[in-house]
């Protein structure tokens, strides 16, 4: 469904922006098995879109290039978010038709499902006229998944713990970027299992960062600790980084547990040209030129 069509057909719409891990440091592991992370996160202008409309009975419909992959999944995060919020608000939660325009690859390291869940919480709160306390929303979001609280914010941030400790980063600038994914699945549990070390150095960012060049230097000196084991599972990840570098990317890195990689470029024109070249070489991959949001939004 085109963007204009979604806005016309549904009274409330929400963007589910792609989540980009500019840095992901694995710094430890809790007794319950969850890994401790320190992440610098931003969000892209591209992503999924959702529409919400009052209905006689609950309905869920799909469109978009990756929508068919979710068909028949009655336990996806959108429906879980709807049901969880309904339990919280009770009788005020009338039946709703939710439409998901699935533009992002499934399980690709850029928070698609988590962003959809967060957008569902935001959209249904608007549709149902709800205004829940921040701590209640944070608890609901974390119940849905470790990435959902940061996707609910959808702005540049540092996340720690398992992702629930969030600190805004108002000085992070916008970046011209290319996202690329070979459309091969990566098992997140297997990536963590293959980690060579689980107590890696913490993420350190100077408090005085302001210029874009300073941020690029800081991001360049950071890392994604999940990238080496993910490359063992999907060698195309390393290939993507090499191809982005060949197109002039200033920084390349994998996002999340993969397999999406990003390249930061000096201008949006350079990013668009690189995306076109990459798509020409690998038309079977997901390739998207985009711009990330700034901390000032």
From Swiss-Prot:
GO biological process assignments: isopentenyl diphosphate biosynthetic process, methylerythritol 4-phosphate pathway; terpenoid biosynthetic process
One MF annotation (Gene Ontology) recorded for this entry: 4-(cytidine 5'-diphospho)-2-C-methyl-D-erythritol kinase activity
Keywords, comma-separated and alphabetical: ATP-binding, Isoprene biosynthesis, Kinase, Nucleotide-binding, Transferase
EC number(s) from the headed UniProt entry: 2.7.1.148
Entries under SUPFAM superfamilies matching the protein: GHMP Kinase, C-terminal domain (SSF55060), Ribosomal protein S5 domain 2-like (SSF54211)
Binding site for ATP: 105-115
Domain of life: Bacteria
Annotated catalytic residues: 19, 147
Record bears the keyword Coiled coil: no
Catalysed reactions, as listed in the record: 4-CDP-2-C-methyl-D-erythritol + ATP = 4-CDP-2-C-methyl-D-erythritol 2-phosphate + ADP + H(+)
Enzyme class: transferase
Pathway of action: Isoprenoid biosynthesis; isopentenyl diphosphate biosynthesis via DXP pathway; isopentenyl diphosphate from 1-deoxy-D-xylulose 5-phosphate: step 3/6
NCBIfam families: ispE, PRK14608.1
Family: Belongs to the GHMP kinase family. IspE subfamily.
Protein role: Catalyzes the phosphorylation of the position 2 hydroxy group of 4-diphosphocytidyl-2C-methyl-D-erythritol.
Protein name, per record: 4-diphosphocytidyl-2-C-methyl-D-erythritol kinase
Organism in which the protein naturally occurs: Rhizobium etli (strain CIAT 652)
């Amino acid at each position: 469904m085109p963007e204009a069509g979604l806005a016309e057909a549904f009274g409330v719409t929400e963007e589910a922006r792609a989540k980009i891990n500019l840095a992901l440091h694995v710094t430890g592991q809790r007794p319950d098995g969850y890994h401790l992370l320190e992440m610098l996160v931003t969000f892209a202008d591209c992503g999924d879109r959702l529409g919400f409309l009052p209905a006689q009975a609950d309905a869920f419909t799909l469109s978009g290039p990756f929508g068919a992959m979710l068909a028949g999944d009655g336990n996806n995060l959108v429906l879980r978010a709807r049901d969880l919020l309904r339990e919280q608000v009770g009788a005020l939660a009338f039946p709703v038709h939710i439409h998901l325009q699935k533009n992002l690859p499934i399980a690709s390291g850029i928070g698609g499902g988590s962003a959809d869940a967060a957008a569902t919480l935001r959209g249904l709160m608007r549709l149902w006229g709800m205004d829940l306390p921040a701590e209640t929303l944070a608890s609901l979001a974390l119940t849905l998944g470790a990435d959902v609280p940061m996707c609910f914010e959808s702005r540049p941030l540092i996340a720690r713990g398992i992702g629930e400790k969030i600190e805004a980063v108002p000085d992070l600038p916008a970046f011209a970027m290319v996202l690329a994914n070979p459309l091969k699945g990566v098992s997140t549990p297997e990536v963590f299992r293959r980690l060579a070390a689980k107590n890696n150095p913490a993420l350190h960012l100077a408090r005085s960062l302001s210029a874009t060049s300073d941020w690029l230097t800081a991001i360049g000196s950071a890392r994604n600790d999940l990238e080496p084991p993910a490359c063992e599972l999907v060698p195309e990840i390393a290939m993507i980084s090499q191809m982005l570098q060949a197109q002039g990317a200033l920084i390349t890195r994998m996002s999340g547990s993969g397999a999406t990689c990003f390249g930061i470029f000096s201008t949006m024109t350079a990013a668009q040209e690189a995306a076109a070249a990459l798509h020409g070489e690998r038309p079977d991959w997901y390739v998207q030129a985009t711009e990330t949001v700034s901390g000032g939004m």
